[in-house]
Amino acid sequence: MKQNITTPALQNIKITDPLFGHYADVVAEKLLPYQWEVLNDRIPGVEKSHSVENLRIAAGESSAQRQGAVFCDTDAYKWLEAVAYCLASGRGKQYEQTADELIDLIAKAQEPDGYLDTYYTL
């Protein structure tokens, strides 16, 4: 027996449970702004991410030396993913411009063939 399973669009999914709704609000209101500051190395006492700075270096916007973990680029991508989910659910509109700017930076940092991994390209 074969069933057709369809995935609903994110915009059509509404979190109505008080517990999970609370966590979705916390992500949009607290986690995203905090994580953005971490990605930009602006939180005293927190280990530097170097994520956004490495993208700036790859984009030619900074002459600093690449630093951080081999995989630190992915932190910026995961932040963008979280913003996208928040936007799709009607939360996080305030991050749209910042997300657009990060997307532009990523596009500028890519190799001509689209490849991007600052550990290997810098």
State where each predicted segment sits.
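Glycan-recognition and catalytic cores of secretory/periplasmic carbohydrate-active enzymes
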Residues: 1-122
